[in-house]
Amino acid sequence: MRLSRFFLPILKENPKEAEIVSHRLMLRAGMLRQEAAGIYAWLPLGHRVLKKIEQIVREEQNRAGAIELLMPTLQLADLWRESGRYDAYGPEMLRIADRHKRELLYGPTNEEMITEIFRAYIKSYKSLPLNLYHIQWKFRDEQRPRFGVMRGREFLMKDAYSFDVDEAGARKSYNKMFVAYLRTFARMGLKAIPMRAETGPIGGDLSHEFIVLAETGESGVYIDRDVLNLPVPDENVDYDGDLTPIIKQWTSVYAATEDVHEPARYESEVPEANRLNTRGIEVGQIFYFGTKYSDSMKANVTGPDGTDAPIHGGSYGVGVSRLLGAIIEACHDDNGIIWPEAVAPFRVTILNLKQGDAATDAACDQLYRELSAKGVDVLYDDTDQRAGAKFATADLIGIPWQIHVGPRGLAEGKVELKRRSDGSRENLALADVVARLT
């Protein structure tokens, strides 16, 4: 993509309304525009990152055996009355009526609808286990939306829902999602720590939040530093095998949010040198809620003994849009964003340091063609901005690799390659650049 043809509305000054780093940098980098309190338009740069995060989430859900569908944003109020949550959910749920006076709501979550879909089609234990997921926009009418995408009113979520004939099967499904989440966040360059959590309005008796450590996080957390060094399963993990050892490895090391923190246990189990009391950002949460929804909504299957029994369920959420904020909070410096390569809007940016110079233009065009032909996402800054402004923009938007092309270097057949993550630079022969990056 040539920057001269791209829509990138960079802001030179820090927006006054931005309270935290991620919100400030997303606005300055032209990724978002606020349309109302907690509601944003996703501009092209932000949308590219959003789609890359979404694809990683999708790939890991598929790898773990979940099946994608898509449910509507609007739901019938009667479904929520059936489960008993319509009145319990509170003012965060946006309730509306259509022209026929039918009561609807803008879904904050989908346990009721997925249970209704399940009970309409699944009648026998032979169709289980089953895990269905979707990636969809949601709305919660936060009283005080703030911090950009970290606490907005409209947000993109991945929600998965598992169905099993008994508790043992449901816990196996829970373990699959636990491992899938470890892999999902690691692929995005994040160290997300699973922590025992309260179940809240979802219900059930087992839940883990996945927390990314950040000083601006909304939750206080207490961890044993050993959890930071635990290995994440690789892509060859056997989801049909016994995942219990992985779960035990991650849950046997102390890690808790302030809501469920046990000070006495923390002090007795964790050596003082290993204690870390900091803050974190929740990027996902998983729940086992047993028969909570199948009991109230009569989602039963015929078991092996011929009798009907309610299914055991779980739900598993990832804040897809929220992850952009979490990644920026964890990956930035004074100059801007530092995107991990897997989620970067572009992998490489070419900076033409003397637009209009024949040799410089030709070298940049050659690099742009050759890298693009190799499947590399390239943003080519072919604008007439001065070099200093181009450097500042490249650092702000956080592209992992910068290629600086100017007459002085080309006189020696060289260009400069800069790595955004550590600022390291190397001079390469023009002919070697493509091989270095592919």
UniProtKB/Swiss-Prot annotation:
GO process annotations (BP): prolyl-tRNA aminoacylation
The keyword Aminoacyl-tRNA synthetase is annotated on this UniProt entry: yes
GO cellular component, one term: cytosol
A molecular-function term among this protein's GO annotations: ATP binding
EC nos: 6.1.1.15
Class of the enzyme per the UniProt entry, highest EC level: ligase
Family: Belongs to the class-II aminoacyl-tRNA synthetase family. ProS type 2 subfamily.
Protein function: Catalyzes the attachment of proline to tRNA(Pro) in a two-step reaction: proline is first activated by ATP to form Pro-AMP and then transferred to the acceptor end of tRNA(Pro).
Protein name in the entry: Proline--tRNA ligase
Organism, as annotated: Rhodopseudomonas palustris (strain TIE-1)
